[in-house]
Amino acid sequence: LKFVVLICLVIMASTSAQQCGDETCGAGTCCAVFSQNHCRRLSQMYDLCSDHADASPSGNYLFFCPCEPGLHCDRNTWTCTEGSSRSE
């Protein structure tokens, strides 16, 4: 019985991400599209990321969120880095 309860808790935790198809994600998050839409935290330093310009018309991002403020998504490595987002 304890095993069944543990399995149920794991399943509930893995599916508890807020659906964002019709809802707005909170501060510090974005709506990332996998097989379903889920609110996810903004990407941090060295995390994989999407560029802000890559948002769909509905404001969703494919797979990864853009970087948190102060960072930009390097389109060569698709990771969040410090510095200017302009190409040099």
UniProtKB/Swiss-Prot annotation:
Domain of life: Eukaryota
One Pfam match: MIT_LIKE_ACTX
Residues that bear Pyrrolidone carboxylic acid: Q18
InterPro entries: Atracotoxin
Disulfide-bond pairs as recorded: C20-C31, C25-C39, C30-C65, C49-C73, C67-C80
Keyword vocabulary terms for this entry: Disulfide bond, Pyrrolidone carboxylic acid, Secreted, Signal
Compartments reported by the entry: Secreted
Propeptide: 86-88
UniProt xrefs under Gene3D superfamilies: Lipase, subunit A
This protein's record includes keyword Secreted: yes
Span of the signal peptide: 1-17
GO cellular component, one term: extracellular region
Organ and tissue specificity: Expressed by the venom gland.
Family designation: Belongs to the MIT-like AcTx family.
Protein's recorded name: U1-hexatoxin-Iw1b
Protein species of origin: Illawarra wisharti
Lineage, uppermost ranks: Eukaryota, Metazoa, Ecdysozoa, Arthropoda, Chelicerata
